[in-house]
Amino acid sequence: MPMTLGYWNTRGLTHSIRLLLEYTDSSYEEKRYVMGDAPNFDRSQWLSEKFNLGLDFPNLPYLIDGSHKVTQSNAILRYLGRKHNLCGETEEERIRVDTLENQVMDTRIQLMIVCCSPDFEKQKPEFLKAIPEKMKLYSEFLGKRPWFAGDKVTYVDFLAYDILDQYRMFEPKCLDAFPNLRDFLARFEGLKKISAYMKSSRFLPRPVFTKIAQWGTD
């Protein structure tokens, strides 16, 4: 029986999950909820089901895999990572995985806050100034490794790809000074399953955010 992934009809918090499901050749189907337009941003499609799915903490995204029902995007990624042995093999690798998972969430939230702010245009210049330092930290953490934990792909590579690609969309030149990050993105996109998925009709790179945001809604 295929797994069910539920989320808005956007990239949002599920891009890395979708990529990981494809990479692991998992059998899954999506329930994509549509949000209404301004000013009400009607969420009735989701709210009508929210408390009827048996979720401990009803939220989007959710993953239902038989008797396992998981919410919170990183919990879903960890679940899939454990299922497919993509959580790191040594203690050093697992530390790197845990560290990067949380760092990506910080970096994601920072972008979400500015993009969803009514003062987006005022805040954008200052935010752009801070991007090089953020990318420098990722570049130094990756170093000469092919993947962020080491020599093998782990689930945090899917998170890292997602956030670096989002920042690249937001500021196309932000990775120009970091060839190892550009190489990482190209290496990831070159993975056989990922490349095939990106060419398919299932691939959803945009919109990045729901309609309440000031950027990334097209």
Swiss-Prot record:
Main location: cytoplasm
Enzyme class: transferase
The keyword Transferase appears for this protein: yes
GO cellular component: cytoplasm
Residue ranges occupied by any GST N-terminal domain in the UniProt entry: 2-88
Crosslinked residue numbers (Glycyl lysine isopeptide (Lys-Gly) (interchain with G-Cter in SUMO2)): 50, 69
MF annotations from Gene Ontology: glutathione transferase activity; protein homodimerization activity
UniProt xrefs under PROSITE patterns: GST_CTER, GST_NTER
Keywords on record: Cytoplasm, Isopeptide bond, Transferase, Ubl conjugation
GO biological process: cellular response to xenobiotic stimulus; response to bacterium
Keyword Lyase found: no
Binding site for glutathione: 7-8, 46-50, 59-60, 72-73
Domain of life: Eukaryota
Recorded family membership: Belongs to the GST superfamily. Mu family.
Subunit architecture: Homodimer.
Protein name in the entry: Glutathione S-transferase Mu 3
Organism of derivation: Mus musculus
Gene, per the UniProt record: Gstm3
